[in-house]
A protein has these predicted regions:
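Interaction interfaces in information-processing and related assembly proteins
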Residues: 1-50
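Short metal-coordination and nucleic-acid-contact micro-motifs, chiefly zinc-binding Cys/His arrays
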Residues: 49-53, 73
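Short, cysteine/histidine-rich loop/knuckle motifs that typically chelate Zn2+
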Residues: 57-59, 79
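Short Cys/His-rich "knuckle" micro-motifs
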Residues: 66-72, 87-89
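C-terminal catalytic subdomain
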Residues: 183, 202, 254-263, 268-287
Length: 287
């Protein structure tokens, strides 16, 4: 079953959906499909009152949380979908994965002397991992780079990742200092995400001079790979969306030719081998 906060969010979504459907139905000539959708919403709200919302109508186990967040009218768990429903879900996941990959930057990215490379491999069809590289509008000057991870899994996480991508693409054009950009992004993200949803994120600006300014919202340390070893750059603020107010101080470093900055998500550091041993931060820094 979902938490009370999630149920409150889902109830709000259902009520808003009902009002929109009723308004559309009033302006139509008795559309049967709209009337059926209104009935489905009423059934879902009734199940909330009875305490059975979120339970599979076949086996009475919980419907997957990410599927309810994506569609509050879901009433069957994955194990009890009909063949047409399963095919429709597979088609939706395939489309979501295609959209998500289309948002990734070029694999080989070069800008003002900087070379960026990344590897993206979701654990399932879609994920909440986020990666972007944004050139300035005039094509010269600093490069904005971001790596993050949103809370949750599956389709719900991928939808949140898409929201994060669109938000930073829009805010990047404002020209704010990095710490102010992060604070504004936090307020926007907090206002649009549901309670309990958040994102960890490293955001940075790289200049042609080799200077790099970094701000981290609760994300795993960035690894500065230098000639003399590896330096960890820790988070400077809380995850985005956790609280609507917060500060995100930045730190500026200077990379010399041949040095690099390694950013990653927990899919790397928490990977386990056949003996169920976690890879861990220490081994990652020793690569």
């Amino acid at each position: 079953m979902e938490t009370s906060i999630e149920n409150q969010y889902l109830r709000t979504q259902l009520v808003e959906r009902k009002h929109k459907l009723e308004a559309a139905l009033a302006g139509s000539t008795g559309d049967a499909s709209l009337a059926e959708l209104v009935q489905q919403v009423d059934v879902a709200l009734d199940r909330m009152e009875k305490g059975t919302y979120g339970l599979c109508e076949t086996c009475h186990d919980s419907v997957e949380q990410e599927r309810l967040l994506a569609n509050p009218l879901e009433c069957y768990c994955l194990d009890h979908l009909t063949a047409p429903q399963r095919r429709a879900l597979e088609d939706d996941l395939t489309l979501a994965a295609r959209i998500q990959r289309s948002l990734l930057p070029p694999k080989e990215f070069v800008h003002a002397g900087w070379h960026a490379h990344y590897h993206y491999e979701p654990a399932s069809v879609v994920s909440g991992d986020y990666c972007d590289l944004i050139r300035p509008e005039n094509g010269a000057g600093d490069l904005l780079f971001l790596v993050g991870d949103v809370s949750g899994k599956g389709v719900a996480a991928s939808m949140l990742m898409t929201q994060l991508h669109a938000m930073f693409r829009s805010l990047a054009t404002v020209g704010l200092p990095l710490s102010e950009l992060m604070a504004l992004a936090n307020r926007v993200f907090c206002a649009s995400a549901m309670a309990g949803q958040y994102a960890t994120l490293v955001c940075g600006r790289a200049w042609p001079t080799g200077e790099v300014e970094i701000s981290s919202a609760g994300h795993l340390p960035a690894l500065w790979v230098r000639r003399g070893g590896v330096t960890s750059i820790e988070a400077t603020g809380l995850p985005l969306g956790m609280f609507c107010t917060g500060s995100y101080p930045s730190r500026t470093i200077r990379l010399e030719p041949g040095e690099s900055l390694f950013l990653f998500t927990d899919g790397v550091s928490e990977t386990r081998n056949a003996a169920d041993t976690e890879y861990g931060m220490k081994r990652l820094a020793e690569i």
